Amino acid sequence: MVPRVPQPGIWCPAVTFFDPKTDTLDLASQERYYAYLARSGLTGLVILGTNAEAFLLTREERAQLIATARKAVGPDFPIMAGVGAHSTRQVLEHINDASTAGANYVLVLPPAYFGKATTPPVIKSFFDDVSCQSPLPVVIYNFPGVCNGIDLDSDMITTIARKNPNVVGVKLTCASVGKITRLAATLPPAEFSVFGGQSDFLIGGLSVGSAGCIAAFANIYELYKAGKVDQAMELHRKAALAESPCKSGIATTKYAAAIFSAKAAGIEDAEEKLRPRKPYDPPSEAAKQEVRKVMAEVAAIEAGLS
């Protein structure tokens, strides 16, 4: 049975494959990819996160991806599903769909479409309503870059978590190690998991009490936890450099997955299938070249690690 609180480690936010001719979901490639990721040393999968282009998917497609993931990874592998939307009602619909499709946790962005109207009381009321009605444990997703600049501070997150036992964690894509420190010092890890949202501050977060990261590079976590700090730091520095070109937009993120993890999963024509969904463009040749360079360096370091 999957624990109520997400377990420490690396949770991978999976990208979404599309049929390049029809711009519809390629569920066969998706299933193969999910199965590969589940075998690669991860703690769990995140379906329908930012990298999955969740806001470009229909409600039916979102449910299809979660169900495909559950089929691919079996009944016991942990799945966290993104359920971000603009209203409380929409979020609750997505949560119920996720529960039916087999998710174990839901990852919830704050409402943000009307930025100036999204006041602290609105945010607190939103998470109160969602957590009370959700059949699944809730993980707060703090990502100012996709939320009109709305940034939940550690006091607000603590207040929400203490009031709502069904809020069991947070993903911080705000790059604040200080926020990780304060939350880890305030909320017991048995009741609340604090995850970083980018690989480039993974070790910084671990050193002050984070549970891990919702990003790539599971081997950095394992090396650090095994006490191989120098090796972990060497790979971590390269991973941090890789974050910049690979995270400059969804197009480069998906291209990096196409030439690295999708290739390892044995998925044919991955570059075509991992183009961003329309109307967004694929990466430029210059961007591709930079991604290839940094990913080759990371792969070389990985190959030399014992």
Please describe what each predicted stretch is:
Residues 2-151, 302:
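Active-site beta->alpha loop and helix N-cap motifs at the rims of alpha/beta catalytic domains
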Residues 3-5, 160, 261:
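Short, conserved catalytic or adaptor-binding loops enriched in Gly and charged residues
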Residues 27, 31-34, 154, 288-295:
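Short, amphipathic alpha-helical "lid/cap" segments that border enzyme active or binding sites
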Residues 30, 62, 66, 91, ...:
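A general structural signal for well-ordered alpha-helical segments in protein cores
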Residues 40, 64, 68-73, 97, ...:
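Alpha-helical structural signal in soluble globular domains
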Residues 129-133, 144-249:
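Catalytic alpha/beta core domains of metabolic enzymes, predominantly
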Residues 141-145, 166-167, 268, 274:
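Glycine-rich phosphate-binding "P-loop"
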Residues 204-306:
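Structured C-terminal cap/extension of enzyme domains
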